[in-house]
Amino acid sequence: MFEPIESVIPLLEKQGYKINDPWDIVDIFEKKLAKFAGSKYAVSVDNCTDGMFLCLKYLNFEGEVTIPSNTWLSVPGMIIHAGCNVKFEDVEWSGLYQLKPTPVYDGATRFTEGMYIPGAYQCVSFHHRKRLRIGKGGMIFTDDKEAYDWFRVARYEGRNLSVPYEEDTHEILGWNMYMTPEQAARGILLY
């Protein structure tokens, strides 16, 4: 059961976190996990599949994407929705695989310290059957600052959360793929 955000903030503040806005919780969670994974940046999303979708859209990749034939059903669907073609290959994998030929990695079942591959866009899942069991959620790890900035806006309907809504210029059309502060708080408390 998820606690209301108002009841979670005091728990986080007791642990030394400074919370001025509920979205600060998301930022804290992202920074903690970037450090754990060994990447410069982490961008939380609502699930791993949507994280990979955002990566393909950011890369503007429209070719053929090769993935293992024994992947989760949402992955080939996501590739098609991103404007690419799917090619399956019969290979065994464990924890992590590349969406070839892109630098995007599906690490839905892997979440280990120092796991980040430099130069990659590495996505993980926080489904209740995964290692960090938030219930729903995912993360994109990257060392690319431009990508990081784009992902943060694209995941939240094209909005820049650091700018008041009435002042935001909405320079891109985004998607509703963000992690809620409640999910991030659960992740901090479980991690």
Annotated model-derived regions:
Residues 28, 50, 73-74, 146:
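Short alpha-helical
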Residues 40-42, 63-64, 102, 136-137:
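Short active-site oxyanion
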Residues 1-61, 82, 177-191:
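Conserved PLP-binding active-site segment in aminotransferase class I/II-type PLP enzymes
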Residues 44, 67-68, 140:
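Conserved SAM-binding loop
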Residues 53, 76-77, 149, 185:
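Alpha-helical elements of the RecA-like P-loop NTPase motor core of helicases
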Residues 57-114:
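PLP-dependent aminotransferase-like
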Residues 111, 121-191:
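Active-site region of PLP-dependent enzymes
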